[in-house]
Amino acid sequence: MIGLPRTFHPDPEAAPYRIDQRSEYRVKSDFRVDFTNGGHIEAKDFLLDIEGTSVAPERLAEMIVSALNLLRAGPVTIFAMNVVRRGEHQDTEAAAIPR
């Protein structure tokens, strides 16, 4: 595995991310996306479905931008990523509704 954190510049022509709820594996990641017009977003323990048992960090950066439909995305910094089996982490419980 490559050393993290690392910053990537996703290809705007990359294949779009597609949700696959039948996927056996997911990638859990911490990242930051900087916008070309200023500002940024960060996420921790963000889950995306993957095909197979691995994903390259460069592809993960592209998947993040596509999944979140970020039109003004600039560099994506991946701080952590880990492939997990669906159901072996806290994604099987319904999210709490804020009151």
Show where each model-derived region lies:
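N-terminal acidic leader/helix
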Residues: 13-53
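Charged, amphipathic alpha-helical segments
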Residues: 2-16
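Acidic, low-complexity intrinsically disordered segments
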Residues: 3-5, 49-99
